[in-house]
């Protein structure tokens, strides 16, 4: 893709593919020092409805002294896009990241993730701490705090109603309408080059990304299944979600979908935690607040 190369020709982006044991092929962009074998590796994991390109401002910053690998999750952009909902179970996406890291050479210096990429990476950090030295997560809640908020907090329940809409059959067809207007409205102000990049990604298909919502047990109650969110909380075992990897949370406090309450009690589930809140920042802080985000990440990586 030409867009980021035109913005930062010195990045020398390379394309790489990773093949998993269950036949999934994951597309990635790689950049960084030519002596990649000596440079520590950072793995970037995007969310919905984005792809590797969402990290372009971080790639420009950290490729100066790190080998940077930004993947497309299964179901997104140039990675494999199985159509069945069951192919997007969280355990399978965690296994995808394990395969990528093992092929890169475990452990990576850090996993840096956002939104759905963060959800998968929270599980990776809890289940496979040996695969990463550090974990950075941007506006993506821990499963336990998210489940509790969906069950008990009216404001977060209201903010998360979009999840139930996306879970409906045919939601991806609606997202395509009017040149992806709903998705562009969601992402906010973009340049013409950025719009072209996202449009090209979405033209590969949206079903995979939407299937993440369909398969997830974490969503607000529906009229058909009242009380389900509370049942999910009761079924969760906190010890399985305990994170011991040194973790840096970067949180935009004005995110309309993921509210600050999702950080309440997070220290109970992460033993080595730093939290940096950005007032006035929303959900897309890697792009909209890149300077501050990059400063926080760099300081944490060096600590």
Language-model features: locations:
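Flexible "cap/lid" subdomain of the alpha/beta-hydrolase fold that forms the substrate-access gate
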Residues: 3-15, 24-26, 32-36, 41, ...
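Glycine/alanine-rich phosphate-binding loops at beta-alpha junctions
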Residues: 21
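Structural cue for short, hydrophobic secondary-structure segments
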Residues: 44-47, 70
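Active-site glycine-rich loops that stabilize anionic/oxyanionic intermediates
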Residues: 47-50, 115
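Serine-hydrolase catalytic-loop signature spanning alpha/beta hydrolases and amidase-signature enzymes
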Residues: 49-57, 68
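A short acidic, amphipathic alpha-helical/loop segment
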Residues: 57-58, 262-265, 292
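Active-site machinery of serine-nucleophile hydrolases
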Residues: 63-72
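Catalytic histidine-centered segment of alpha/beta-hydrolase-like enzymes
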Residues: 281-294
């Amino acid at each position: 893709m030409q867009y980021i190369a035109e913005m930062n020709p010195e990045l020398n982006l390379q394309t790489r593919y990773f093949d998993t044991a269950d036949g999934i092929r994951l597309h990635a962009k790689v950049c960084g020092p030519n002596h990649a074998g000596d440079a520590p590796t950072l793995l970037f994991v995007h969310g919905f409805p984005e792809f590797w390109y969402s990290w372009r401002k971080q790639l420009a910053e950290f490729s100066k002294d790190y080998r940077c690998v930004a993947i497309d999750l299964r179901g997104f952009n140039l990675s494999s896009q199985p159509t069945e909902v069951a192919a997007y179970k969280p355990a399978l996406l965690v296994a995808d990241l394990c395969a990528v890291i093992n092929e890169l050479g475990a452990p990576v210096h850090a996993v840096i993730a956002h939104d759905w990429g963060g959800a998968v990476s929270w599980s990776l950090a809890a289940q496979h701490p040996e695969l990463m030295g550090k974990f950075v997560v941007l506006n993506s809640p821990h499963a336990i705090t998210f489940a509790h908020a969906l069950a008990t907090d009216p404001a977060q329940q209201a903010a998360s109603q979009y999840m139930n809409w996306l879970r409906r059959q045919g939601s991806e067809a609606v997202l395509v309408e009017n040149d992806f207007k709903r998705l562009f409205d969601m992402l906010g102000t973009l340049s013409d080059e950025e719009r072209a990049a996202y449009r090209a990604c979405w033209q590969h298909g949206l079903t995979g990304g939407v299937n993440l919502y369909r398969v997830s047990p974490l969503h607000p109650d529906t009229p058909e299944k009242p009380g389900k969110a509370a049942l999910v909380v009761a079924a969760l075992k906190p010890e399985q979600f305990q994170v011991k990897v040194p973790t840096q949370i970067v949180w935009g406090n004005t995110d309309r979908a993921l509210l600050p309450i999702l950080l309440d009690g997070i220290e109970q589930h992460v033993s080595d935690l730093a939290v940096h809140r950005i007032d006035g920042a929303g959900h897309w802080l890697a792009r909209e607040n890149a300077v501050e985000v990059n400063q926080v990440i760099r300081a944490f990586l060096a600590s």
